[in-house]
Regions:
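Hydrophobic alpha-helical segments within soluble ligand-binding/sensing domains
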Residues: 6-42, 95, 134-154
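Flexible, charged surface loops at secondary-structure boundaries
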Residues: 34-37, 78-84
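A short, well-structured beta->alpha microelement
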Residues: 65-80
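Structural motif
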Residues: 5, 44-49, 88-93, 119
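Flexible loop/turn connectors
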Residues: 81-86, 93-169
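An alpha-beta-alpha
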Residues: 22-66, 157-169
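Short, charged/polar "capping" segments at the starts of alpha-helices
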Residues: 9-10, 49-55, 94, 123
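Short helix-capping segments at alpha-helix termini
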Residues: 63-69, 104-109
Length: 169
């Protein structure tokens, strides 16, 4: 069984994948009205990030088609959080960095700047009144994988990306 990004030929294999391209784009579309409170979107995508590079293309496409200013920030260490910007963080450490840096700048998450995180975790429910996230259902992934292992039931599935809307947007 393959648990992966899914961008390769895999007809003969069982797999459970997360779509980081079109599903990412569609999730941004679902959040479009919330995102409109901020004129600029910044994707935090450090140079050595183990994440599909194609997400950058879908992010840029969304911004161009929907009329947002967009930026892909590779230097996360020297990040300055600015008013009127939504930060999209892929790594948990980047979520913490944005929240802490925003506080140092005297800015409030969800009012002065927005924050959208990849891969929901329980602490996102309580950090700064809640961090909006894009995530698959990890329990579903585990159940599907267990069913494959225990019952040898073949599977070829992309898990849906869910939006968990909280006060950070």
């Amino acid at each position: 069984m393959l648990l992966d990004f899914g961008k390769f030929e895999k007809e003969k294999y069982s797999y459970i994948c997360q779509d980081f391209d079109e599903a990412f784009y569609q999730a941004l579309l679902m959040l479009k009205e919330k995102l409109r409170h901020y004129p600029q979107l910044v994707l935090l995508f450090s140079k050595n990030l183990k994440h599909p590079q194609s997400s950058k293309e879908y992010f840029t496409r969304f911004c161009e088609e929907q009329g947002f200013l967009c930026e892909i920030q590779e230097d996360i260490e020297n990040l300055t959080v600015r008013k009127g910007v939504v930060y999209i963080a892929i790594k948990q450490q980047d979520v913490v960095k944005v929240v802490k840096q925003g506080r140092l700048e005297g800015l409030k998450c969800g009012r002065d700047f927005g924050l959208l995180a990849y891969n929901d975790i329980p602490s996102y429910e309580v950090i700064d009144e809640g961090i909006t996230s894009l995530s698959i259902d990890w329990e579903m992934m585990g159940n599907e994988a267990a069913n494959f292992v225990l019952n040898n039931v073949p599977i070829q599935k992309y898990l849906p990306t869910e939006v968990r809307l909280r006060k950070s947007l």
